[in-house]
């Protein structure tokens, strides 16, 4: 676990196993680094954000505003039914969505809405604006949130490209050294921030 930093027991010499996580080219929550390697920037967000005041889907730009998100990637095994319904509503209006296989199968807590979620997800994944991406390196009983060395290779990048979703700034070839974030100010100016891993 590269987040751990120091091995249990601490100490000096061979007992010290510190690692700067900023130098590790690894996914933390979403495991694949293929999106960032190809210039895509992303954030982790709660489905509750989609219903927050001032957040809307802009049909003209085909983005979630005010953040400018061009697509959503759903990779967690849980998703609340209200969030799924909002995603379905926007996907019908043109929002691009990629669902990683095995994602959005359960609702939070024990709210009794798993069947409702399943119906929403079945309708969502049938839309032309939605793709289901396969995990290429997962065993049969793979759980995305178990601490196993699987789930790092998937079809999300290909699905986004098939949907026509491109990064605001992209590299000529995959880059394992730079991590970028793009922001736009009120005047419509884009800013690209790059972090160099090396």
Q: What residues fall within each predicted segment?
A:
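Carbohydrate-binding surfaces of carbohydrate-active enzymes
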Residues: 1-198
């Amino acid at each position: 676990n590269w987040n751990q930093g120091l091995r249990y027991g601490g100490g000096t010499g061979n007992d010290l196993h510190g690692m700067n996580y900023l130098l590790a080219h690894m996914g933390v929550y979403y495991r694949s680094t293929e999106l960032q390697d190809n210039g895509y920037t992303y954030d982790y967000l709660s489905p509750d954000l989609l219903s927050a005041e001032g957040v809307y889907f802009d049909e003209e730009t085909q983005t979630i505003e005010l953040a400018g998100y061009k697509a959503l990637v759903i990779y967690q095994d849980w998703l609340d039914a209200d969030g799924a319904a909002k995603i379905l509503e926007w996907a019908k209006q043109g929002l691009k969505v990629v669902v990683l296989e095995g994602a959005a199968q359960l609702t939070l807590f024990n709210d009794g809405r798993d069947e409702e979620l399943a119906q929403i997800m079945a309708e969502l994944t049938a839309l032309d604006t939605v793709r289901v991406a396969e995990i290429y390196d997962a065993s049969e009983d793979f759980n995305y949130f178990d601490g196993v060395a699987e789930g790092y290779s998937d079809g999300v990048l290909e699905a986004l490209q098939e949907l026509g979703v491109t990064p605001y700034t992209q590299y000529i070839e995959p880059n394992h050294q730079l991590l970028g974030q793009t922001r736009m100010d009120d005047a419509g100016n884009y800013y690209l921030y790059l972090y160099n891993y090396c």
